[in-house]
Amino acid sequence: MPIRQLPEILINQIAAGEVVQRPASVVKELVENAIDAGATRVDIELEAAGGRLIRIRDNGHGMAAQELPLAVLRHATSKIASLDDLEAVATLGFRGEALPSIVSVSRFTLMSRRAMDEHGAVLQIEGGTLGEVIPHAHAPGTTVEVRDLFYNVPARRKFLRAERTELGHIEEWARSLALAHPDLELRLSHNGKLSRRYKPGDWYSDARLIEILGEDFAHQALRVDHSGAGLRLHGCIVQPHYSRSNTDQQYLYVNGRAVRDRSVAHAVKQAYSDVLYQGRHPAYVLFLELDPARVDVNVHPAKQEVRFRDARLIHDFVYRTVQGTLAQTRAGTPPLAVGAGDVGGEGARPPVRHAVSFSGRRGGASHVLGSYSASTAPLMQSAPSVSVADAPAAYAALYAAPPTQVIDAVPQMQTGLPLAAGAGDVPPLGYAIAQLHGIYILAECADGLIVVDMHAAHERIGYERLKRAHDGIGLRTQPLLVPMTLMVAEREADVAECEAETLASLGFEVTRSGPGSLQVRSIPALLAQAEPEILLRDVLSDLSEHGHTRRVAEARDTLLATMACHGAVRAQRRLSISEMNALLRDMEATERSGQCNHGRPTWARFSLAEIDRWFLRGR
């Protein structure tokens, strides 16, 4: 078959395969055009989940009558005029491909009017044939009607899913849009019935979060807002125990554009690494703002992928911001009070809410902490830097279990919550009143009951102390008597050569000895017995894919977590009331104390109102 120029209609239909995948794609492109036109209200009307009709009405600037035919021409746009405009584009659309692609696979009607015009105009197109532009009564703004989507491409129409499924995709996209544009009023109707309505409002208000993402998300949200290096990251992440089995509540926006980015997703997941249960995923709504010239949005016709000029900086910025917010969480602290400031910046950390002054009447701080410190002294000590092989012996003394202490079966109630104490005087986790089956601590707080898994809580406290101790020591290296030869792919050898300084900071002294071979002369001392070959390969893989790695830190943390687990107080160990109270105070002062090292929750709160409902009180 000879080479020939394809007809315009076929070109547009081929392009539609990338831009118009389903009705939700059409809704996305048309509503983004409305937002770029300055609309503050958008109405979406659907029939048969968009398969029969998609009608988008907006109150934007509108178009002049003579511009309607231009709007549906390929690569015709009002948003860019030069390469400089493209490199700094801030609008949601700019390619001039969406409308021609939609026109080529539907029966299309375009109506518009500017506020300055006496009347509007309408243009109808079917099968790629443009009708005439004729005057038409219309309010200021634009209306687009897309009927019989894929009517002329039967193969594409057969791939559409059930009506409920297609509507679900549109509703999910509307949710994402409402999160990104809280000043936009959005109405979604299906088959003549109002399905969703998002009113303009403050994005950070509880009502807005509850309306879009539900009460559970809103009540577990930790606010994020950090700026630095010309970047700003703000939004919400949720506490680790509100994890998900999938990634359905992960929303990322770059300069207001909903995108998917593996590097940012990887950074967030790493920040949650030691507080998230295995196989679970964090939920978040994050907005990344930066100079448009530092991000390339012209990667894919659907504009759902971006490419950062400095991906390593972005990864590190997101990781540190999210990790810093999680580190501020303390057991008993209300979620929305956390991270409301400039997380990670100077003076950003809010005052710790659990800083409470104890008096002798409330249990005697010196006596309580002294008793608890004596019984758990091993975890108060700095951990030595040892190899994995030497760890059990070195830490045997450090974690030697103190002799079992037995207390009265019924604890004395006056050691619990003082009756005269006001709500403002009670620490977040309250005061211990009893121990349940040698496993759980029961504590009375200002508004109900706190239940603490004492082993899980003590495990996290010990883990954080060990991490701080080793952070103070720094990462020590262990030279090898005989250099180790490691055979790798040539690409990995290139990475090792380019990232020699990074590897040295991680404890690896590596030189290239051939196209696909490396000489390893030193390794991290703490991880000498932890399969350094596999660890180094993983580090090189991360550096190649993400430009960043935490493999060494994660391997170290895994070892420290194991040590902390072995050193934590065991089930059936009887604690005195004073020891339990001291453990509660330590939880309030320890980062990430809401989860153990494996991501399990360490405590739960039952409000008095909730307990009253169990017994039908007040009815």
Curated annotation (Swiss-Prot):
One of its GO terms (cellular component) is mismatch repair complex. It comes from the Bacteria. Coiled coil: none annotated. InterPro entries: DNA_mismatch_repair_CS, DNA_mismatch_repair_MutL, DNA_mismatch_S5_2-like, HATPase_C_sf, MutL/Mlh/PMS, MutL/Mlh/Pms-like, MutL_C, MutL_C_dimsub. GO terms for molecular function: ATP binding; ATP hydrolysis activity; ATP-dependent DNA damage sensor activity; mismatched DNA binding. GO terms for biological process: mismatch repair. SUPFAM superfamilies: ATPase domain of HSP90 chaperone/DNA topoisomerase II/histidine kinase (SSF55874), DNA mismatch repair protein MutL (SSF118116), Ribosomal protein S5 domain 2-like (SSF54211). Keywords: DNA damage, DNA repair. Belongs to the DNA mismatch repair MutL/HexB family. HAMAP family: DNA_mis_repair (MF_00149). NCBIfam families: mutl, PRK00095.1-2. This protein is involved in the repair of mismatches in DNA. It is required for dam-dependent methyl-directed DNA mismatch repair. May act as a 'molecular matchmaker', a protein that promotes the formation of a stable complex between two or more DNA-binding proteins in an ATP-dependent manner without itself being part of a final effector complex. This is DNA mismatch repair protein MutL. It comes from Xylella fastidiosa (strain 9a5c). The gene is mutL.
